[in-house]
């Protein structure tokens, strides 16, 4: 590959002609081979340039953002991860929450009612009480909704029956299309809960392992890991009610706006991006708690499904009590067990 040609191409894409930018591009290109080795990346000759261009732009974005973080202008750091080479259009395919898929369906949910005079702790983290399975990885399939749904049901099942069982996302990807879900092309957690209720269960992860692609349904009622009796929606946009719900009920499925390069490249800290919407939701994740950072304020603890190498060992802390940042409280629900 002619890296001088690539240098010119990237500069043209960024459309800024400056000595500083040229140095940043050169520095990023020098890190490319190390990145490929560190993350075990292999590309065909025809596709490597595309991924390298994306990597270079992301490296520059990381460097500029982290400079602002060091100056106290940002509350979180960004860094390289296994998806730092993805062009933004490919990255967006990971975000498979499809709110429109549910608009034409009749809702069959219950509404969350907070216990009377309830007092909840200042901090909650359900990872400490064995209600949360290890971080999983959806791969390049837009099945985030399935991971969010299984995560909530895993927690409810463990809370009620005392046993944490990893459940099958592939079962939901393959078998819940009649409920409005579209496998690797997206879906909704509530529709997954409806499928599980009517199907009288979802298989265990061990019996129906994840493949990361749409396949023929082969649910087996003999290997069911958990069931639900329906689901509960929390009040839309109400962070205080969501705080009470996660404190009293356990892990909760939520949808967020993850359609930003800052989210793709998040490394650590309390995530706050002024561009993050409370309505344009595109990614299903699992809320497992909340807390307060002494420097950057209140946050939610959110489990992602992009592997333990992303973010804070697979998790992200999202700003809390900042006008429903990224829509954490807009579409939240949990299954009834």
Swiss-Prot record:
The active site is at 144, 283, 304. Residues 19-119 form a propeptide. Pfam families: Inhibitor_I29, Peptidase_C1. Its EC number is 3.4.22.15. Changing residue 230 to R: In yq89; temperature sensitive. At the restrictive temperature of 25 degrees Celsius, causes an accumulation of germ cell corpses in the gonad in an age-dependent manner. Accumulation of abnormally processed yolk proteins. Belongs to the peptidase C1 family. Cysteine protease which plays an essential role in the degradation of proteins in lysosomes. During early embryogenesis, maternally required for the proteolytic processing of yolk proteins in platelets, a lysosome-like structure where a slow and controlled degradation of yolk proteins occurs. In the gonad, required for the clearance of apoptotic germ cells in the engulfing cell phagolysosomes. In embryos, required for the degradation of endocytic and autophagic cargos. In embryos, may play a role in the degradation of lipid-containing droplets. Required for larval development. This is Cathepsin L-like. The lineage of its organism: Eukaryota, Metazoa, Ecdysozoa, Nematoda, Chromadorea.
């Amino acid at each position: 590959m002619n890296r001088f040609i690539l240098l010119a191409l990237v500069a043209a894409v960024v459309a800024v002609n400056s000595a500083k930018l040229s140095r940043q591009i050169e520095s990023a290109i020098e890190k490319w081979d190390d990145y490929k080795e560190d993350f075990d990346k292999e590309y065909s000759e025809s596709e490597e340039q595309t991924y390298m261009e994306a990597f270079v732009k992301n490296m520059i974005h990381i460097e500029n953002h982290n400079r602002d973080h060091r100056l106290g202008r940002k509350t979180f750091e960004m860094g390289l991860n296994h998806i730092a080479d993805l062009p933004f259009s490919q990255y967006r395919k990971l975000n498979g929450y499809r709110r429109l898929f549910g608009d034409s369906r009749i809702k069959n949910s219950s509404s969350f009612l907070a216990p009377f005079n309830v007092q909840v702790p200042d901090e909650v983290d359900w990872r400490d009480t064995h209600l949360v399975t290890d971080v999983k990885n959806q791969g390049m399939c837009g099945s985030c909704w399935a991971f969010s749904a299984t995560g909530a049901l895993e927690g409810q099942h463990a809370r009620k029956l005392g046993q944490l069982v990893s459940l099958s996302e592939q079962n939901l990807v393959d078998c819940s299309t009649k409920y409005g879900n579209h496998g690797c092309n997206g879906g909704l957690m509530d529709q997954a809960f409806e499928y599980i209720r009517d199907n009288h269960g979802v298989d265990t992860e061990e019996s129906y392992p994840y493949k990361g692609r749409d396949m023929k349904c082969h649910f087996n009622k003999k290997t069911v890991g958990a069931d639900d009796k329906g689901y509960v929606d929390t009040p839309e946009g109400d962070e205080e009610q969501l705080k009470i719900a996660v404190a009293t009920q356990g892990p909760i499925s939520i949808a967020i706006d993850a359609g930003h390069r800052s989210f793709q490249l998040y490394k650590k800290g309390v995530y706050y991006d002024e561009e993050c919407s409370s309505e344009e939701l595109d990614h299903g994740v699992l809320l497992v708690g909340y807390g307060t950072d002494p420097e950057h304020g209140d946050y939610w603890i959110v489990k992602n499904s992009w592997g333990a190498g992303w973010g804070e060992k697979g998790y992200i802390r999202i700003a809390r009590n900042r006008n429903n940042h990224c829509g954490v409280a807009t579409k939240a629900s949990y299954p009834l067990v």
